[in-house]
């Protein structure tokens, strides 16, 4: 399938299309459609199968990807700055972000799987609509709907405690600082991204 490239949303056919050096500042989403895949994230090996949804907030923290011969997935890379520029009133993003740093895999129900597959397929299809006069805003709203679906799926699996607005802001700034430090270290070649978090 042809790759669709835009600086804010990118779809690839393989995990190799999303190399960490090309994807800094991007969040990687993988919806497994068939087969299986494994990878290492924070020294833990994860094995995913059909119906699993992976969100890697920082692609450089994952390695040792391997796919089964029948592996098929929707692989989407999102510009973090594009996502944060959208007017989300919910603060769930920071809760989900911290949780994903601990475990980036969500096991979906059949209904949630269909919903995510439809959302992502629609985004990929509309990404090709280059003549749309309000393309960026239209894609932003489609993406926003998908993100809110993901918040709902993730939140149903846990009972989050309310977090004050100031704490959310400080956590967001702290995470951004860690990513910047990680990028600087990886560019210098002296340290692995993992060492920044130790």
Language-model region placement:
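Short, Lys/Arg-enriched, Trp-marked, Pro/Gly-tolerant hinge/linker segments that flank
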Residues: 108, 130-138, 150-190, 194
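A hydrophobic/aromatic-rich effector-binding and dimerization subdomain
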Residues: 67-129
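Conserved metal-binding segment of the jelly-roll/cupin
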Residues: 48-61, 77
């Amino acid at each position: 399938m042809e790759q669709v490239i835009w600086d804010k949303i990118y779809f690839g056919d393989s995990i190799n299309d999303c190399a960490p050096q090309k994807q800094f500042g991007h969040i990687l989403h993988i919806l497994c459609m068939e087969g299986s895949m494994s990878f290492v994230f924070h020294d833990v090996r994860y094995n995913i199968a059909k119906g699993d949804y992976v969100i890697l907030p920082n692609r450089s923290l994952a390695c040792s990807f391997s796919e089964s011969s029948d592996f098929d997935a929707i692989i989407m890379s999102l510009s973090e700055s594009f996502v944060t520029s959208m007017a989300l009133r919910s603060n769930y993003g920071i809760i989900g972000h911290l949780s994903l740093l601990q475990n980036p895999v969500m096991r979906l129900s059949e209904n949630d799987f269909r919903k995510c597959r439809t959302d992502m397929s629609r985004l990929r299809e509309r990404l090709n609509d280059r003549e749309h006069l309000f393309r960026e805003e239209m894609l932003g709203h489609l993406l926003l709907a998908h993100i809110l679906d993901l918040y709902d799926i993730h939140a149903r699996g846990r009972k989050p405690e309310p977090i004050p607005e100031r704490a959310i802001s400080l956590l967001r700034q702290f995470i951004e600082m860690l990513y910047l430090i990680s990028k600087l270290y990886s560019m210098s070649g002296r340290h692995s991204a993992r060492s920044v978090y130790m």
